[in-house]
Amino acid sequence: MKNIALIINDLKGNGAERVVITLSESFIALGHSATIICFNDFIELPVNKKINVLSFNINRWRWIPRSLRGRVVSYFLDRFILRKIGAPDLILSNLLPVDRIMCESKLSNVNLVVHNTMSSEYKFNLDLIENFKHSEVFKIYSKKPVICVSQGVADDFKSLFPLHEGCNQIYNPINADLIKTYANECDVPYKNYIVHVGKFKREKRHDVLIKAYAKAEIDKLLVLVGQGALESEYKALVSQLNLTGKVIFAGFHSNPYPLIKNADLLVLSSDFEGLPTVLLESLSLSTPAISSDCPSGPREILPSNNLFPQDNIDKLAEFLSVPDYSIYKTELPDKFYADTIAKKHLTKA
């Protein structure tokens, strides 16, 4: 039996957090021990009772200068891990706030999981690669092996770290059976609708989706599932385009699967992604899905006929205007199933 630790800031309802839970469930199903360690006691998502969830309060070290904090906190985190679960056979560190600490860890087999295209997320200009080499991000991700969640993320990483020898690509997992169970847990108050699931962040490009929806003039609701800093801005845009009552701001749902299952179509309109879990969830529920052909991930999940040019309102409006969304229906590829992905991670333990 392998002892696996997955470390993340919290368990809010975002893609990386869902992936950590799914991976933990898969490790346990295969007969191994999985522990999730969070830096904050913020849990919005349902967590299997078989998963050991521990809290490591990072806030007590906020007073330490940032230049020293990583080394100091990693020392105490290493001791915390050894005391609570013993020496892990595999450690998966997720997202920059955690990677900033775990890159300094003295424990063995620490892997930093890269969930997004760094050149897009951190706005790095590859023409200024020498400047990038002096950045904090470069220093963090040069210190440990990394696991990239899609081939697009891996290609982007290698362009930024051409000399890094520890870059591996393993897809994010999807537990299709569990998602189908969750999808039947409650009724949906909407009918005849298109759905988007994601935080109201600039890179998700809700503005493109809302404008394309207005241009398409279709007799369907647009249901936006999520929350975030830009929500008020997008509500103002909806009002400006006279779409009040047609665009529904449904808020955050810890279980969005009934809304995905009962939708006529799921849309992703992002400027960039890592491996968009929501597309995998949509396919597992047999809901047609379309996406911007953004870097990276969508083209590794969907056929080309389901991809529209990034930041193209007119083309997205065309996709929304087709009379039958079943043309966008596609099967979930086997390579994304959770047990397959968990076994790939275990080869590194």
Where do the protein language model's features map onto the residues?
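A charged, aromatic-enriched C-terminal amphipathic alpha-helix characteristic of glycosyltransferases
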Residues: 15, 325-349
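N-terminal strand-loop element at the rim of the active site
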Residues: 6-14, 18-22, 26-68, 153
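Short His-centered aromatic/hydrophobic patch
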Residues: 92-99, 114
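Aromatic "clamp/platform" in nucleotide-sugar-dependent glycosyltransferases that forms part
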Residues: 252, 271
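A short, active-site helix/loop in glycosyltransferases that binds the activated sugar's phosphate group
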Residues: 101, 142-167, 174-176
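Membrane-proximal helix-turn-helix segments that form the acceptor-binding/catalytic region
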Residues: 80-81, 128-147
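A conserved mid-protein helix/loop that constitutes part of the nucleotide-sugar donor-binding site
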Residues: 17-22, 192, 196-215, 229-235
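Conserved acidic donor-binding segment of nucleotide-sugar-dependent glycosyltransferases
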Residues: 303-314, 321-324
